[in-house]
Amino acid sequence: MKLFSRETTVGIFRGFSEGGLEFHADLVLPYKNEFQRAPMHGQFLVVQLEDEEEAVLGRITSISSQGRLASSAGEDYGIRAVSEERPIPEDLREQYLKYRVNMRVLGLVRVVNGDLVFAASHRRLPHVGSKVAFLTDEVLREVAGHNIDDAAEIGYFALGEFIYASGDPRLAHAPWMQIKSPLVIPKFHVIDLVARRTLVFARAGFGKSNLVKLLFANLYRNTPTVEKRGGKQVPVGTVIFDPDGEYFWPDDKNRPGLCDVPELQDKVVVFTPKAGPSLFYQSFVAGDIRLDIRRLRPSDVISIALSPEKQDQQNVRKLKGMNDADWHQLVDLIHRDGNGADGHTVRQLLRLEDGQEAEMVAARANMTTIVRMLHDPSSQMMDMLLAALREGRICVIDISQMRGTPALVLSGLILRRIFDHNQEEFTKAQPETIPVIAVVEEAQAVLGSTGSSGEGPYVSWVKEGRKYDLGAVLITQQPGSISGEILSQGDNWFAFHLLSAGDLKAVKSANAHFSDDILSSLLNEPIPGHGVFWSSVGGKSYPIPIRVLSFEGQYQARDPKYDQPGADTAAAELRYRFNAALASARRLVPADTTPSALQATMTEAPHDEPEVDEEQDTLATYEDASIEAFKNDKAFLNRLTQYGVPWKGVQEQLKKFIPDVLSDRDNMAYRLVPKAMTAIFGEQEVGWKTEKRPAKSGSKPTTWVLVLQGESS
């Protein structure tokens, strides 16, 4: 590999110039007629150092004319020549015209054993008169990332109208394009999306969604993994919050979604309230998007679901401070009766005095809003989502019918649940963290300065998530609305056409690699699909202009006539597993319980869903089944009756009867202890009680569960 050749050498180095935070060099290039047919602004150059095996790498940022032909006398001559309609002779241009080029220094390139090595070093000084050259085809491919091994193709190297796509049939030719040789396709290690922050900026219609679908189609050809303690390889899941319903199924223009990528058939899981357009696409659906908020911490739900100005109100403080049992009862009460819920019962659950009627009414109204917005007692969505993420699936959550606050609240609760889980598991001896990439559209709504109620979980995820293997892909049309401290933490940047000066300045302020010459191209070249890519990860920390490959050009709708049968998908397997667990639990529950809505969750065809009069309370079914199994465990109950058992022992015994498909079995078992004891032995302090006893380890006392009388059930 050679850095310099006779054909590519074009000028000389003149010296370094003042550039503020940037290193700039002044170059002199003689007049050459072919310059007007080649891309100049943004083109890469090399300046020779000690020998031709190493050079300074730079990018042209500006060009100005010099020489006698650019002087006052030369201008007069040129004007006369134009007015007399005669061309300026080429020999005059060659003798009396040259170009002054300002080059931004990007680093150092060196040929080592035939390979090109880049170092982001700016300490070397070329001598005045050192030769300057454009990159040879081989070096250009290396500098632009064409030769990166085991990486995904993201697009073509492109400088405005000039696209380096010679001979590639995937490029859809347009009249304005100038196809250049060689073929240069920058590549990106999509595994670098994991546990890192990726930013995608563009106005609507310039390729944001196309890029994201392309990245994840490439990332999940083979399920990505991260290495954990002991060399254990753990799969990485992705959760995509889709506000427009464009990521999973084909849209009304038949543009494909992720379900149309054959390699992703067993990797895409969709949560949506919509019915699929065909049996094939419906088979990717795992369930609805609503949650069972009884299984979430009241402080999390209230702090995310209610606006910041309400957080200091007395009724809100009371709601956030509720224990799990009271929260469970309150949600059930509000779900059943709404604002008509019995005020006395609400006061009791909130521990309010008789005179605090206003607080009770306000709390009831707030809870009614939250429950109507989010709650579904038959939901297993959170468990199914976490199970799918553990297995390394792409989970698309369709929030297109939950515009505004409800969508932010739902996504915020999901991110908080995943973040808290990983935080709790992080330091355990056998951690079970779930590496997850969160894809967030309209990121300015949750990372801006508007004080949105859903902002907290997003900020925590972006700022602190990396150490817990939590990555984020933040997509926005308004980077200027996102906090600079968040933007500056971005690891991978994809910037397309932007219109606002404020947005362009915000990009430069957060990442000075996007200097004025790049911003001017983003502003003045509104070409859909054209953008600039920069990453701090791959060892090439300089911007690369690209034209992104078309996702639509690589994939087509797999069921264009909507007449294909259901497919064997990850979602179908997930549904089967959870429905089997629920059916097994229902068989243990006495027959006088609520009628089942189980079949409604098992159907795959949108047209044969059965009519269900009453919804199934899934949590109650699992709890009742666990209590029934616990009630039949005679050996354990005999030991409990005779000697008593530590609370933890009862909890662990109950945990055995809770299906392992549920994500929070420990918490469920803990909350179930008093309910199970009351169901079998009667009310607390009548049939059973708890007492503190010294622990064997000598630490804080242990809570024991004791039976006061024989079984009363």
Regions found by a protein language model. Give the residues of each.
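Conserved P-loop NTPase motor module
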Residues: 528-713
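P-loop NTPase motor domains
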Residues: 228-233, 245-255, 275-460, 535
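N-terminal pre-Walker A segment at the start of P-loop NTPase domains
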Residues: 146-186
